[in-house]
Amino acid sequence: MKNLLTLIAAISFSTLLAQGTSSNLRRVSREVEKTMSITSDIIDGVMTYEKEKKVVPLIEEQFGIWRKSKRSIARLDEPEEAQLVAVVGENLGQIIELTSSNLRDWLGEDPRSSYGHTYVGQMEALFGAISTEMEAYATQYDITLRESAIVKRFNAQMELVAYTKEMKAGAAEVDSLVAYLQSEIGTTDLDKLYAAQKNLIKALSKHIRSYGNEYFYNGQTDLYEAYQKYYVELLELASADLLADLTKMKYDLVEFNSIASSTEASARKTLSFFDNEMKLLAKREARFVKKNLPKAPKK
């Protein structure tokens, strides 16, 4: 009988411990996700080169969230949570320090350095350390962790940043249409370079489309579709190249202290050209599916 009572007491204690550890982990997870969510907003601003006045309020909000979370996590004073609380507290503190000092200073720079990518890498490492500790705690106490929408968003951000960084690392200057045009035309006037790029793409796309239409009228629909696909990829490539060049010239090159607003307007007009081309292509594809294309031109 005594052994049975001891067993029941042990089971009850284990159940209470499991409930307590699960509840505490959920609390820590909620507090971490609050900081992660606002940090994701900050990263969006950093990677799209938002102005300082738009990102600073987010930094201040992040600091306010952290102060409340710090007090909430500090209430967990059981021995089981000691390591979890220490790791989470230390890493959240570093996140706030890097954001409130280094990042805020960087936002005031003109032109800005490449610290934005460094900052994102630091955030990924610090949140990764927190996640590793939380997973270890969950494993130790047999708690099931579920990935929230906030965590999914943050992970997707990190994947996107890694992808773009890898893409830029593998790109040479000769791959840039603007860089090529600059060497051929011999001018550094960005308005002229963007205009030349637009005309080049426009001429090339017209050439490709005329070939594609000719194949369609001759009944070679497979080749027609292949040309249409190539045309879409051409527009996407040119659009991406233009955006990358604009961003690089505006923020990364030290010799450009400022970029005239006319340059930005020129780039926007060029991008709107690509948008219109895509809309026209969508209409043509709809007519192609419905077998309602215009008649072949008379020879």
Question: Where in the sequence are the language-model features?
Answer:
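Bacterial Sec-dependent N-terminal signal peptides
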Residues: 1-25
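Residues marking helix boundaries in flexible regions
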Residues: 9-12, 202, 209
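Intrinsically disordered, low-complexity segments enriched in Ser/Pro/Gly/Ala and basic residues
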Residues: 11-13, 21, 28, 38-39, ...
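C-terminal amphipathic alpha-helix
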Residues: 20-56, 102-193, 237-299
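N-terminal, post-signal-peptide region of Sec/Tat-exported proteins
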Residues: 41-78, 190-204
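Short amphipathic alpha-helical coiled-coil/interface segments
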Residues: 59-66, 88-92, 96, 123, ...
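Short, solvent-exposed, charged loop/turn and helix-capping segments
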Residues: 67-91, 101-114, 205-229, 243-247
